């Protein structure tokens, strides 16, 4: 049962998404989070209260041409991705070290297992839209470990040893404190 007082009085929930039906959410009414390279809209337990405790969330990612979904992994969630427009170029490395690269077209479904390292990008000339369903009720930034943030926490001397490049190269790299989520290739 939904607590209507909490649902309709919570300032974190945009009024445009609220309906008299507790099971209905207007994703199109959520202001997208904008990035250089695309945008993200999502429904999760913080803005769609019926999801609390259900271990479910949904995202709509739009990548502009040249946009990249930052290489990342989710420690506690798998995801199912449905391409609704455009072509996504995928790279996925699973927990067994299997590495796959492929293109996903409209109506193709891509599964990224929990803990797998993955990303997709838009190498095309039109926007790419991917609908993502995850088995977590948390917002994307609460169950997402991006490569930029991860590499920023490793000392330059260690990265130098791994890649065989002078430590100064890594010391001069921009430090990233949060997952970027979406970026643009240069």
Q: For each of these PLM feature ranges, what is it?
A:
Residues 60-62, 84, 120-121:
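Beta-strand cores of secreted/periplasmic/IMS beta-sandwich domains, seen most often
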Residues 71-73, 92-93, 100-101, 129, ...:
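Intrinsically disordered, low-complexity regions enriched in proline, serine, glycine
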Residues 126-174:
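A contiguous, mid-protein "functional segment" used to position or interact
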Residues 65, 74-95:
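Glycine- and acidic-residue-biased ligand/ion/polar-headgroup-sensing regions
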Residues 78, 89, 105-106, 114-140, ...:
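Ligand-binding loop in jelly-roll beta-barrel domains
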Residues 1-60, 64, 70, 160-186:
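A short, N-terminal "cap"/entry segment at the start of jelly-roll beta-barrel domains
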Residues 63, 80, 94-115:
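Short acidic-glycine-tyrosine-enriched beta hairpin
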Residues 50, 70-74, 101-102, 121-122:
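Short histidine-centered beta-strand/loop micro-motifs
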């Amino acid at each position: 049962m939904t607590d209507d007082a909490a649902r309709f009085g919570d300032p974190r929930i945009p009024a445009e998404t609220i309906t008299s039906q507790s099971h209905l959410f207007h994703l199109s009414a959520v202001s997208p989070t904008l990035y250089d390279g695309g945008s993200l809209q999502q429904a999760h337990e913080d803005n769609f209260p019926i999801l609390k405790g259900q271990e479910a969330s949904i995202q709509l990612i739009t990548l502009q041409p040249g946009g990249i979904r930052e290489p990342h992994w989710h420690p506690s969630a798998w995801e199912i991705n449905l391409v609704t427009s455009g072509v996504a170029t995928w790279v996925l490395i699973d927990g067994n070290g299997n590495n796959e690269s492929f293109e996903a077209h409209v109506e193709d479904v891509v599964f990224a297992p929990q803990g797998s390292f993955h990303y997709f990008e838009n190498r095309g000339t039109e926007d790419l839209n991917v609908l993502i369903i995850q088995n977590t009720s948390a917002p994307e930034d609460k169950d997402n470990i991006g490569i930029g943030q991860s590499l920023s926490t490793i000392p330059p001397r260690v990265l130098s040893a791994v890649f065989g490049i002078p430590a100064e190269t890594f010391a001069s790299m921009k430090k990233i404190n949060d997952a970027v989520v979406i970026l643009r290739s240069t």
